[in-house]
């Protein structure tokens, strides 16, 4: 089927990769009926045992499922958002907002959470430092 790839929670991996080749695509004539995440946005699982732990940056535009949330910044700060959403500070705030039987955070509650945004040059410095440290750890 030609169309836009559909990403579900199972397609966002714990290693931060996203499986686009899952065999599910939304035909072009139906894409408008789905939630769409643009390329370079961040998808995060917000429900169940993987909530707040499965997260990745998209390489392409996708349709996505109910248990995922899309963070689509207006400027090129996706990597900063990606790293912030994995920080102990955010995870603590996220975890304290979980509720329900399966443990999740609603999109409405996420919209109320504060994401600190320093000046762009500081954002770039933070991202570059995290990348350098990660690279030296991976070795």
Task: Go through the PLM ranges and name each one.
Residues 44-45:
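A generic structural signal for residues embedded in beta-strands
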Residues 62-69, 79, 99-120:
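A short glycine-rich beta-alpha junction/loop motif
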Residues 80-89:
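Glycine- and charge-enriched low-complexity intrinsically disordered segments
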Residues 76-81, 124:
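Short, conserved charged micro-motifs
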Residues 48-52:
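Short, charged beta-turn/beta-strand-edge "cap" motif at the junction between a beta-strand
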């Amino acid at each position: 089927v030609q169309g836009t790839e559909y990403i579900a929670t199972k397609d966002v991996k714990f290693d931060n990769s996203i499986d686009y080749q899952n065999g599910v695509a939304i035909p072009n004539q139906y894409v408008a009926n789905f939630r769409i995440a643009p390329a370079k946005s961040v998808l995060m699982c917000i429900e169940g045992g993987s909530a707040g732990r499965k997260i990745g940056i998209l390489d392409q535009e996708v349709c996505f499922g109910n248990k995922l949330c899309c963070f689509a910044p207006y400027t090129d700060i996706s990597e900063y958002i990606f790293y912030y959403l994995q920080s102990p500070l955010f995870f603590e705030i996220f975890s304290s907002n979980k509720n329900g039987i399966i443990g999740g955070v609603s999109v409405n509650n996420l919209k109320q959470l504060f994401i600190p945004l320093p000046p762009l040059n500081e954002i770039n410095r933070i991202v570059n430092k995290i990348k350098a440290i990660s690279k030296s750890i991976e070795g």
